[in-house]
Amino acid sequence: MKQAMTPEEIKEKKPYLDWSLTEAEYDYIRTQLLGRLPNYTETGLFSAMWSEHCSYKKSKPVLRLFPNKNERVLQGPGEGAGVVDIDDGQAVVFKAESHNHPTTVEPYQGAATGVGGILRDIFSMGARPIASLDSLHFGELDNSTTRMKVTNTVRGIGDYGNCMGIPTIAGETTFDPCYQGNILCNAMSVGLMDQKDIQQGRAAGIGNAVMYVGAKTGRDGIHGATFASADFNDENMTQRSAVQVGNPFMEKLLLEACLDLIRNHPDWLVGIQDMGAAGIVSSSAEMASEGQSGMELNLDLVPQREPGMSAYEIMLSESQERMLLCVKKGHEEDVKKIFDFYDLEAVTIGRITAGHDYVLFHDGEEVCHIPVSSLTDDVLEEESLEKKPARIELAEQQPAWIPDIDNVAEVLTALLAQSTIADKSSLYQQYDSQVRTNTVAGPGSDAGVLRIRGTHKGLAMTTDGNGRFVYLSPEVGGQIALVEAAANIIASGAEPLAITDCLNYGDPTDPEIFWELHQSVQGMADACREFNTPVISGNVSLYNENNGQAIHPTPMVGMVGLIKNIDRVIPSFVQHPGDKVYLVGQTRDDYAGSELQKMMTGDISGIVESFDLHHVHQYMQRLLTTMENGLVSSAHDLSEGGLGVALAETVFKTDLGLKIDLADQHTARLFSETPGRFIVTVAPEKATEFEQVLGKDAHLIGEVTNSHWLMVKLANGELNENVAKLQETWEEAIPCQLKSKD
């Protein structure tokens, strides 16, 4: 087929500039890697594979700061997902991915295909997905466009996950004006497997087959990788052709077929990989690179649902529900029979070749002949300029903001109605959290918890991130993101194992934004080392801007923890009247970036103060010990809204109350957001032993009561509020806002 442009026309007209390939990169490819002008198809492949979304060419130097190994890690970054040993020959597999740009443009399909893509990463490793999580960040709900995007994003996540029969058991949803023009949709999936079934995305063995399985290839999602590597503007906000369209029913069949092959016929399979960003070119080139092999593909054999597709379109399509397999020669028909059983296509489209060349044929002609390494290993890493933002320099010279609170009841009630704090059940009730009946704790708890059938073990999982803290103080904010995730895991009675992440930032060519990325990753990395929670997978999503307005830097931490005895799962809500109430951790005047500051001033400002990361980790480990020894009745970590909001949340959906004595604390401290704190309830007969373990880090502040009242005594006031009244405010806030009219 005739190419859309000749190599000479490409050199002259430079269409690659619209595909996120720079002129310097193009010149390097033609002079240093190929020694000739690349043709149209080849230029398109380089544009996709050298995009930030696929290559991490800007962020890779920063990503090297992360630890990625410890005694439990079986597979770290580089494969479809990370794998962690959970004893007894079993492993947990997990990863998070962003689908921010597609979801901003087309919320329903963008969110749905984000779920589908991350599920394929999990089962491509040989694991069965057992849970989904999300991290969603929207503009304010007083905007009709935001309300539409919230509704459709949540519906997309729910529809895809529910059709797959995989519970969505945890997540977070926040609202801030910075996400108005560029929402964040981060999806996480967790899978369970036997360690013997771990797969790799590799293609090796001369003569072995390259097999395409799953849905047909269409024109949806072409250049989705480069779309995700550019800022939004008025022109590309309507670029719906870069958004994929999902079919969860086909994905369910694909999952079962792949696991059938992996578990029952592992000797037929060399490697397997999802066709995600950049479609066939990404999966095939990465597998060939991993196997140090050459590869030859005949694109005429690729199943296509639209006529007249060019080689360029076939290779860069991001049609969903597709996988690429490397199958041992002679077993092609055996593999085909498995996929036939599930009514799925399985076609041999190429072979592994000697050498290291990547060769494509289309319409009987050779349309690509380049080294495999030129697509995967020879990408030019970019040195980015960094500059500390002037706003931070200025804030460091200003006095800290301390709120003046006259009516503590009014402030607490107003905070409970803030969108980020308010009850999200009207959103997550659209997700099936109980399917497969392994869910012990679902949405609304500090972490989602699943039992592992046939064992006494359980898995706890969470997603956490706070862009406000990172915006004000990137390094400390990065630490807080990790500490908040660990706090949610430990509050459930689980030992943190490892993390995945989504690094959501603006344009990295802006020196201030790259400085934010660097500093926050440094903070996260320091916290990962302290907590021994390596980064085993994840992704980077840059260029989250709209017409030059960047989001707050928002690293999302997805963490999984191991519960040794599922009977010792710790609930988030108070359990027994008469139990002692403890505040674990120190409270300071930490209001910069808090929900209280945003509510009272309409903005955020100041510096997020550093804290003793090692000390926080030490007492969190001691707290976990008390849980494992059966000393704790309930636990809830403190986050948005501080102690006041957390106290209310522990008695919501119960018929109990709290009597709290904070006579040594001024009123504002009730809403401080000092990290690493917990509300813990303990039976009176276990209180002495609990205090002996926690020492000065546990502060007795009250007791659980039979009355449905929240009573708090403060140095300069009192709070006496009916819990049912507070709960009504908390529950009705988001439904009322979603129904409002502009």
From Swiss-Prot:
GO terms assigned for molecular function: ATP binding; magnesium ion binding; phosphoribosylformylglycinamidine synthase activity
Localization of this protein: Cytoplasm
GO CC terms in record = cytoplasm
Q: Which reaction does it catalyse?
A: N(2)-formyl-N(1)-(5-phospho-beta-D-ribosyl)glycinamide + L-glutamine + ATP + H2O = 2-formamido-N(1)-(5-O-phospho-beta-D-ribosyl)acetamidine + L-glutamate + ADP + phosphate + H(+)
Matching entries from SUPFAM superfamilies are given as: PurM C-terminal domain-like, PurM N-terminal domain-like
Pathways involved? Purine metabolism; IMP biosynthesis via de novo pathway; 5-amino-1-(5-phospho-D-ribosyl)imidazole from N(2)-formyl-N(1)-(5-phospho-D-ribosyl)glycinamide: step 1/2
Q: What is its EC number?
A: 6.3.5.3
The UniProt keywords, alphabetically, are:
ATP-binding, Cytoplasm, Ligase, Magnesium, Metal-binding, Nucleotide-binding, Purine biosynthesis
Q: Which residues bind ATP?
A: 56, 95, 501, 538
Enzyme class, spelled out: ligase
Protein family per UniProt = Belongs to the FGAMS family.
What is the name of this protein? Answer: Phosphoribosylformylglycinamidine synthase subunit PurL
- Organism placement in taxonomy: Bacteria, Bacillati, Bacillota, Bacilli, Lactobacillales
